């Protein structure tokens, strides 16, 4: 089965990084799902997060399920967490929360693992990237479960400007001048008088830029500076959002990958992965 079969595309995710999950075993996915279901329904005590959250109390949890996929020659192993639930205010509508856990897209050396004091053998698993799409209150509870059950740290995956540029290179090689939608780029400044700058480039103009075999971004920066005297390469400006016909990525870790990008999704997710194992 492909990611498309799991409704992966055309929805917005928030990206996270996880430290190794200790005591996690693929052979125990059914039991882990049952534990999470019980945790979401009843919590661990009667005075904790669950009874204090009115928003979470509105959720009626049906079931949490972990499923293993991937591990092929073209795609690494990944897990999918599905949580089905209703809300007390609307019992007629079935809702679902999703989380994808991806193992490393690149092979780390044993030296790197030793240096970062991470043992990837035995009953610990390292997921380099997790993509979450679920109600905020539900996610807080799932995060708490993973931290308590597997002694893992979960951190927001902020997307640096360099990674956004890497995605633009991947996108340029993929579209081959065939895009029918404009490209939209946004830079933030941190200056209250000019908080952000957004530029939209029409498809016909993109085709002209793409005639060159080189990366279009430096050419675009020169053109903008020449026409507007605005130097977007200045350190004051930080690329914060890339909106293409294949995917939307933001520096805050939000991303939406469209079904058109199926043949580059591996490269896009690889670009989000850290170049070396992080230290926790």
From Swiss-Prot:
It holds the Pfam family CENP-L. One of its GO terms (biological process) is attachment of mitotic spindle microtubules to kinetochore. It is found in: Nucleus; Chromosome, Centromere, Kinetochore. Its main location: nucleus. It comes from the Eukaryota. The keyword Metal-binding does not apply. Coiled coil: none annotated. One of its GO terms (cellular component) is kinetochore. The keyword Cell division applies. Keywords: Cell cycle, Cell division, Centromere, Chromosome, Chromosome partition, Kinetochore, Microtubule, Mitosis, Nucleus. Component of the inner kinetochore constitutive centromere-associated network (CCAN) (also known as central kinetochore Sim4 complex in fission yeast), which is composed of at least cnl2, cnp3, cnp20, fta1, fta2, fta3, fta4, fta6, fta7, mal2, mhf1, mhf2, mis6, mis15, mis17, sim4 and wip1. Belongs to the CENP-L/IML3 family. Component of the kinetochore, a multiprotein complex that assembles on centromeric DNA and attaches chromosomes to spindle microtubules, mediating chromosome segregation and sister chromatid segregation during meiosis and mitosis. Component of the inner kinetochore constitutive centromere-associated network (CCAN), which serves as a structural platform for outer kinetochore assembly. This is Inner kinetochore subunit fta1. It comes from Schizosaccharomyces pombe (strain 972 / ATCC 24843).
